[in-house]
Regions:
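Trp/Phe/Arg-rich N-terminal binding region typifying the photolyase-homology
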Residues: 1-172, 176, 282
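Glycine/tryptophan-enriched, flexible segments
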Residues: 152-314
Length: 315
């Protein structure tokens, strides 16, 4: 019997989730975890509404995993330490997560991979070191999947977009059928029996995280997977007018899905598939905006200096 740990990050949903699908398909028992990253939270204002948005999304993930027969372990601290320690404690054979492309996230993931290797090798010297598997999930094409004919990264959007569209096939828009293997989720009873005092299996409050309580009504966006779904369905009714209305705030012409895409409560594959399936200028313009996300992540990967500097400084 093999087991794995899925680390939720900027992918706060239980459907069409690459890492969760691959873990469930490959292992008999799959644990799930979310870490409230203290290295990030400690730098934020105590009234930062992003934390409330994330908290609501985590609550929904926990509820959905419970409905599917699983559970969500909640931790707070530095994931560079928390994830390897949890993997060693659970005795899993692998940790699964979806890839992040920001420089700080790349450094974090490299440290997590090294600490997993070091800790698990020390705790289980007779076994192969645990693996840390990362999957593409928040973009359609990543890193080096769309390049110039010379094999170099694009630096101008329109040629990148044209190459992106040329490469696109239905294969890249296929959803991951997580529920097909949901029986492999490790449930609450398993965790409470094995670790009755050590693991938090409930979502903390904002106050417990050190933040000011926020009335859900004060959040300007509906939250979580259900909120993202609602916004998407509402936007499909306005899609035909997107190209003309998006630049006018009073027209309510945008999708309002930016935060949901940022934290993964919606699936980029689902959105791109819908946009690609529709005709008209509105759908084409929205698809172009979704392609821009891939372009930006590709630029961030190849040119990490853009985090703090101009991409092409004026000479």
């Amino acid at each position: 019997m093999t087991s794995a740990l899925v680390w939720f990050r900027r992918d706060l949903r239980t459907f069409d989730h690459a890492a969760l699908f691959h873990a469930l398909k490959a292992h008999d028992a799959v644990y799930c975890v979310f870490v409230f990253d203290s290295t990030i939270l400690d730098q934020l204002p105590r009234s930062d509404r992003r934390v409330a948005f994330i908290l609501r999304a985590v609550e929904e993930v926990a509820e959905d995993l419970h409905r599917m027969g699983g559970s969500l372990i909640i931790l707070r601290g530095d994931p560079r330490d928390q994830i390897p320690q949890l993997a060693a404690r659970l005795g899993v054979q692998a940790v699964y997560a979806n890839r992040d492309y920001e420089p700080a996230a790349l450094q974090r993931d490299a440290a997590v991979a090294e600490n997993i290797r070091r800790l698990t090798s020390a705790d289980q010297p007779d076994k192969t070191a645990h693996n840390f598997f990362l999957f593409k999930d928040q973009v359609i094409f990543e890193c080096d999947e769309v390049l110039t004919q010379q094999g170099t990264p694009f630096t101008v959007f329109t040629p990148y977009k044209n190459a992106w569209l040329k490469k696109l096939t239905p294969y890249y828009l296929q959803a991951y059928p997580v529920e097909r293997y949901a029986a492999h989720l490790a449930g609450f009873d398993v965790l409470k029996t094995a670790y009755p005092e050590e693991l938090m299996l409930r979502v903390p409050t904002l106050q417990e995280l050190g933040f000011a309580q926020t009335d859900p009504a004060d959040l300007t966006l509906p939250t979580g997977m259900r909120g993202g779904r609602r916004l998407f369905l509402e936007f499909t009714e306005r899609l035909d007018h997107y190209a003309s209305d998006r630049d006018f705030p009073a027209a309510n012409g945008t999708s309002s899905l930016s935060a949901h895409l940022r934290f993964g409560t919606v699936s980029i594959r689902q959105l791109a598939a819908y946009a690609q399936s529709q005709s008209g200028r509105g759908a084409a313009t929205w698809l172009s905006e979704l392609i821009w996300r891939d372009f930006y992540q590709m630029i961030l990967w190849h040119y990490p200096h853009v985090v703090t500097q101009a991409f092409k400084p004026v000479m």
